[in-house]
A protein has these predicted regions:
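Nucleotide-sugar donor-binding catalytic core of glycosyltransferases
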Residues: 8-17, 129-198
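Extreme N-terminal starter segment of soluble prokaryotic enzymes
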Residues: 1-5
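Extended catalytic core of nucleotide-activated donor transferases of GT-like folds
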Residues: 7, 14-126, 142-147
Length: 198
């Protein structure tokens, strides 16, 4: 597929990811259409002159564009991606357990892309009928394209954590608020989830 659709205008980080991938795809020769979810009807109107049947694909994040938005559905509830035979490559950056309601009604030519091997294992176990892959490990933006950054071996810290992390103490008051049996029950759930994440 030489023509690719990306979304912006909804969640800032996912718009940023889309623009970064779109830029890289343009550098290797793809045509790109940036669909602005904050202006859906105007974007849809501009999309159709760009669209080429059999040569256009959607690359999106976390089910944007396939989560029931009315401007992507026809009068029968058919998704635009199905009506136009557009394959969709959905990069899911959160655990798929949050998206069961979307996974049960994906477009026909849907490809689920995981960023975590355990998410991928979860998909194989609970949604084997869905095309899973290719795996896409996390990446980043080059802050120093001129390579002026400090090499890893000379850095003060050798690990960087990017994401949402809350120390257990944040939740401790909720876990231990009733009695020992209640506390043991919740710690047991945490231990089980850590031992069996999928």
């Amino acid at each position: 597929m030489k023509k690719l659709i990306f979304f912006v205008g909804d969640i800032e980080t996912q718009g940023y990811f889309s623009l970064q991938i779109a830029e890289a795809m343009q550098e290797i020769g793809h045509e790109v259409f940036i669909y602005d979810l904050s202006k859906p009807w105007g974007s849809t109107e501009k999309f159709f002159p760009f669209f080429e049947r059999g040569n256009t694909a959607l690359i999106n994040f976390n089910f944007h564009g396939m989560s029931g938005e009315e401007y992507f559905l026809d009068e029968n509830g058919t998704m635009m991606w199905d009506a136009l035979s557009i394959p969709s490559y959905n990069i899911v950056v959160d655990h798929p357990m949050y998206y069961h309601h979307f996974l049960e009604k994906v477009p026909r030519n849907y490809h689920h892309i995981s960023i975590d091997r355990k998410h991928e294992a979860y998909m194989r176990r609970f949604f084997p009928e869905i095309i899973n892959g290719p795996f896409l490990p996390l990446a980043g933006t080059k802050l120093y394209p001129d390579r002026s950054n400090v090499p890893v071996e000379f850095r003060k810290y050798d690990v960087t954590m990017v994401g949402n992390y809350c120390v257990l103490a944040t939740f401790e008051k909720y876990i231990t608020r009733i009695d020992d049996e209640y506390t043991a029950f919740y710690y047991g759930m945490i231990d089980d989830l850590l031992a069996n994440p999928w």
